[in-house]
Each structure stands twice: as structure tokens, then as C-alpha cells.
Amino acid sequence: MIYSEFTTEQNIVLHLLRRNLHPSKEGGLSKELCESADWNEVFLESLRQAVPIMAFDSAAEYREYISEEIFQRWLMTSGNVFQTNERVAQAQKELVAILEKEGYRYLILKGLAAASYYPRPEFRGLGDVDFLVEADKTKEVGKLLVKNGCKKWGCAHGHHIAYQRSDAHLELHFEVAGIPYGDAGERVRAFLKDMLEGGRKVALSTGDFVAPNEPYHGLVLLLHMQHHMLGEGLGLRHLCDWACFVERTANEPFWQETLLPFVKEIGLFTYAAVMTKTCALYLGTTCPDWAADADEQVCAEVLDDIFKGGNFGGKDIKRAKSAMLISERGKGGTNHSKTYNLCHGFHAYTRAKHPSCQKCFLLYPVFYMVEGFRYLGLMLAGKRHSPFAMRADADERKAVYDKLHVFEKEEKQREEK
């Protein structure tokens, strides 16, 4: 199917993904479309969206329309992603062995946990190894990582500590990403408090590990998606993660018994429904009854946002950075002003980068000035964008995100209507 609101090349990328996820359901492209397409742009778009292997696997049947140069570059890029996947998977395998040997409970988040729902798990591109441990074991596990050759990397974040190996980046989570402020955040923490008690044992060719049980995995994906969408930006890889999860589990009772009642409780139901229907419309996956009424125009706007930004906002850095005016990476929804978001985000950044502030609040003004002048210097050097220059991008993005009602209770949504 070809969608008029998207370019030929974007339509082909979507077709290639549908063909990869559901080969028996998706027909082929017409000769006219293949001949008119810019296949280099198709390749580049798949790369910007972090889905080059899936797209290349399906594109092989259209090789006669793709120049040898482009085909070989796509092949080489896919090979490089495969090599990265192997390194990351090996790093995870060694990490799991260390944790299990020492008796630490853990869960692998996203990454290979998400890939396990794909028809071909090896086609899902990997980045970091994200894993969750008990919060009070964070220091012990951190020391264990250092003992085994890892180095602490960067400053602490609100939910994880990063470590670097020679071959991979590890993120030691003491909390999952995307948990909001306020009452919704407390409800999420209460929902996830027993997350480490069980777990889903996953056996892949790259190694065995423990992942979250399905209701937890679903919530982790939703929190992660909105965290990045309202942050630097979401890519098609994230959308494929959700599509594959829904496709594999749509008929499981946990949706009606556990997950959907909870996302309604915290104000994520509209978001979940829109993302699910977006997957159904454009990636060909199942659309459960609970998502059938999601606004198709909003779904189209969400996909347009994904195409404009690319994976982690890599297609347009200014647009990605405009997130500082929209929301603090989704933690407070989208109901605050640009000034509030800018100031609140700046405070959170300073607090994370300079932990000494938490011990002596009098240091805050000092580090506010340090970070403020640092940003000003980078801005004058042309290495950062002025918040004023990002207002138009922020307004355009926020107009879409407001329709998703992230962390808004249904009563409030009805009042707004």
C-alpha cells in the first residue's frame, strides 16, 4: 500500500519492513514505483531509522532496480550492523554469566529482550546492553563490572549508570527509563516493584538470559518510547519493537487483566492505542479492538514525526534538541510552558552532572552559572543552538504530542474536549 502523505522512498521503507515482518501478507512493489524510486534515499532512510538489515533483507528481491554501488553499500552496512550485534550479544552473554555466577538477580531490558519477539531476532539492530538490578545492589554490581574490566562512563543519570567495555556500552539500571514525576510515577514504581521476582527466560542463538515478564516488558517499551519521542526523537526501530511485541502477544490475557487497566490508570492508554494503530496501519501488524478507535490522522502525524526526526533525532539535531522546550523527556507530560521545561530540564541536568549539589544546595547557583556560561560559549561557537531558534521545531512537535495525552488521565482528556 502507498500512502500519499509520505514520499515514495518512505513508502518503500515501510513496504520493506512489512515484507520482512509479514512476508505472506504483503504483496510486491510495482515496476513503475521501483523504477521511479531513489534507492540510495531508501537505503539512507533505513539507516537513519536504524532498520538497515530488515530493509536490506526485503530489498534483495528488487535488486534489478538498485545500482550495484548502492546494493554493495547497503550490504556492507548491514554486515557492519551484524558485527556490532555480535559484539553486543557477546558482551551481554559474558555479563549474564558474571551476574549469575555471583548470584545477582537481573533483567535484560530492550535490546535482545525486544528482539526476541521479532520473526528474525538477529535482524534487530542492537546498541547498548541495558540491564536492571535491585537498586540496593547497584554499587556492588558496579564494582563487579569494574573488577571485570569495565570503566565508568560519563555522569550518572536518573535511572542508570553507564559503563564501557572495549567492545560494548553497558547501562546498569536501578530503575527503568521514562518514569514520570508525581502520582503517576509512584504508581509505576509500585507496579514494577516485583519486576525482578520472576522473569521470562529467553533462549536465542546468541545466548540465554532473563527478560521482563510480558506485562512488564510492555510497560517498559511504552515508557521507553514516550521517553525518546518527547526527548530527542523516535525511530522506526522503536516502532518495530512495539509492533512485534503486540503481534506476538495480542491474544494473551495479560492485556485486559493487567497492562491496559494500568496504562489507563497512569494516563498512557491514548499513547498506547495510537502507537498500536500506527503499527497496524503502516507496519501491517495486528490491531486489537482496544486500539481500533485511535485517530488515524494522529497516527499519520506520529509517523511523519518519526520520519522527520530519525532514530534518536539523528536526521535533524536542532529539531532533536528542541525537546528541551517540549518536556523533560516525557517525565511531566506536555502540559508545561517552554520556560518551565527549559528551567526544569536545566536544573535536572545540573543536578545529575554535579552530585555535590544534592549534598549542599548552596552550590546550585554556582553550577547553574558554570553550565549556563558553558552553553552560551558553545552557542557562540556555533556548536549549540539557541533556544529561541528551536521554538518553531518545538511548536511543531508539541502540536503532535499534545494529541497523545501522555500521562493525562481520561477525565482530564474529556474536560479538554
Where are these regions (language model features)?
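Conserved NTP-donor binding/palm subdomain of two-metal-ion nucleotidyltransferases/polymerases, i.e.
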Residues: 1-127, 133-417
